[in-house]
Curated annotation (Swiss-Prot):
The protein, known as: DNA-directed RNA polymerase subunit alpha
Species of the source: Spinacia oleracea (Spinach)
Enzyme category, top tier: transferase
Positions of region (Alpha C-terminal domain (alpha-CTD)): 263-335
Similarity comment: Belongs to the RNA polymerase alpha chain family.
Record's keyword terms, sorted: Chloroplast, DNA-directed RNA polymerase, Nucleotidyltransferase, Plastid, Transcription, Transferase
Native organism taxonomy: Eukaryota, Viridiplantae, Streptophyta, Embryophyta, Tracheophyta
Gene name, Swiss-Prot/TrEMBL: rpoA
Molecular function via GO: DNA binding; DNA-directed RNA polymerase activity; protein dimerization activity
Locations listed in the record: Plastid, Chloroplast
Quaternary state and interactors: In plastids the minimal PEP RNA polymerase catalytic core is composed of four subunits: alpha, beta, beta', and beta''. When a (nuclear-encoded) sigma factor is associated with the core the holoenzyme is formed, which can initiate transcription.
GO cellular component terms given for this protein: chloroplast; DNA-directed RNA polymerase complex; mitochondrion
Length: 335
């Protein structure tokens, strides 16, 4: 019989967007679901995704403003309604979308009387403004306002260092997070050991990314963080490779009939290879060869597997051991 830790599911894990709306240019909302999950998995994924969405996605902000003849941040300028501090706070709120790496320069140069908005910022071609109507200042007199700006792409929240004002250059607190908020909730259904979960994920962004784009990027970042653990499997001691064990010829396809005969109740196409607890390197090799289920695996011969890129005879031996463990079949001693 199949051991209890292999849970046969007739459903494939699926996600979809169930709600999407734009409340304003700088506030987008998306609601997503992922199901069916086993008990406990929804909370694991929800917590990880929330952290990745809030902390791992990069954004672009104005991090410094420079203008001549301004003595300090709290001074006022004749002919401008706002104080320097208020102008800096308005610049902080400007939402940018870019493919920027590191920092770059931008500027504002206008003559009053008139209102100054985000549309007046002169940007490099690879940076764009999400909402051109965002207010910066009001010029009440026929004066010139020229401000040099520094743009930076980063992640998280950077607080300006105290006493970091020099030559009319003022640092600005930067909120690089395109995702403004994330909520996750869990709906459980079923009974006893068959209980399953649905994960609901709500995402609010500032408009520089859509919630769906943010979800993709956070997922990629999570995968990148875990890849070193997968590579560790490939860095095993070289001495292990010096003791190769020859295996008796065995064809998975030849065993398929016997497994089906003895295990009629096993839905082979619904047992996925990730349920077999294979090492990450073997698992990745199989997935890259479009082997996703136990049925896919058993439809390949030993020779087919060894021909796969980066696949070794030791890996085939380990698959033998895994199938023996889960199906209580001594594959190596059966021809």
């Amino acid at each position: 019989m199949v051991r209890e830790k292999i849970r046969v599911s007739t459903q494939t894990l699926q996600w979809k967007c169930v709600e999407s709306r734009t409340d304003s240019k700088c506030l987008h909302y998306g609601r997503f679901i992922l199901s069916p999950l086993m008990k406990g998995q929804a909370d694991t994924i929800g917590i990880a995704m929330r952290r990745a969405l809030l902390g791992e996605i990069e954004g672009t902000c104005i991090t410094r403003a420079k203008s001549e003849k301004i003595p300090h941040e709290y001074s006022t300028i004749l002919g401008i309604q706002e104080s320097v501090h208020e102008i800096l706070m308005n610049l902080k709120e400007i939402v940018l979308r870019s493919n920027l790496y590191g920092t770059c320069e931008a500027s504002i140069c206008v003559r009053g009387p008139r209102g100054v908005t985000a549309q007046d910022i002169i940007l490099p071609p690879y940076v764009e403004i999400v909402d051109n109507t965002q207010h910066i200042a009001s010029l009440t007199e026929p004066i010139d306002l020229c401000i040099g700006l520094q743009l930076e792409r980063n992640r998280g929240y950077h607080i300006k260092a105290p006493n970091n004002f020099q030559d009319g250059s003022f640092p600005i607190d930067a909120l690089f997070m395109p995702v403004r908020n994330v909520n996750h909730s869990i709906h459980s259904y079923g009974n006893g050991n068959e209980k399953q979960e649905i994960l609901f994920l709500e995402i609010w962004t500032n408009g520089s990314l859509t919630p769906k784009e943010a979800l993709y990027e956070a997922s990629r970042n999570l995968i990148d963080l875990l890849i070193p653990f997968l590579h560790a499997e490939e860095n095993v001691n070289l001495e292990d490779n010096q003791h190769k064990v020859s295996l008796p010829l065995f064809t998975f396809h030849n065993r398929l009939a016997e497994i089906r005969k003895n295990k009629k109740k096993i839905a082979l196409k619904f047992i996925f290879i990730d349920q077999l607890e294979l090492p990450p390197r073997i698992y990745n090799c199989l997935k890259k060869s479009n082997i996703h289920t136990l049925l896919d695996l058993l439809n390949n011969s030993q020779e087919d597997l060894i021909k796969m890129k980066h696949f070794r005879i030791e890996d085939v031996k380990q698959i033998f051991g895994t199938l023996e463990k889960h199906f209580v079949i001594d594959l190596k001693n059966k021809r």
